[in-house]
Amino acid sequence: ATAPITIIEFTDLQCPYCARFALETWPALRARYVDTGKVRFASRDLPLPFHAHALPAAVAARCAGEQGKFFEYREALFRGQARLAEAPYDAIAARFGLDAERFAACRANPAVAQSVREDAAIAKANGIASTPSFVIGREVEGQFVGEIVSGAQPLETFVERIEAALAQP
């Protein structure tokens, strides 16, 4: 079954407000809406130009995702955000039991970084320039229609917007 509402997140793994959302708001949001099938959550990357470690971190998280550990890996990056300059990617991968060779090959693949840049281009084309930003909406006649929520808003803001979207016919 597909969820009636989709939230598309645009995040930067070096952004402190993105970390706040991921560590404080996301667990409750996931439990209440994603795990219950009411909302589909898609994470997209928007590495900001002044965050030198955001692109390599995004690539590493995607590569962890190829082995089924995206959200766990992302949480570890957010928790260790102050140490991103040390490029802890392989150590975190080992902690989650990822295949090191596969992980390294993925990180070295230029197509992965290109897909991160494509997410950023989509954000820009839709007027999204800050992180975290979210688009909460649904598909209507083949088009995604939604509203943008900017910043690490409290859970209540998401609940209000999601419930309003769910109430629409």
What are these model-derived regions, one by one?
Residues A1-T2, P154:
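Short capping/connector residues at structural and topological boundaries
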Residues A3, I8-A94, D99, A104, ...:
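Structural alpha/beta surface segment adjacent to cysteine/selenocysteine redox centers
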Residues F10, D90-P169:
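C-terminal cap of thioredoxin/glutaredoxin-like
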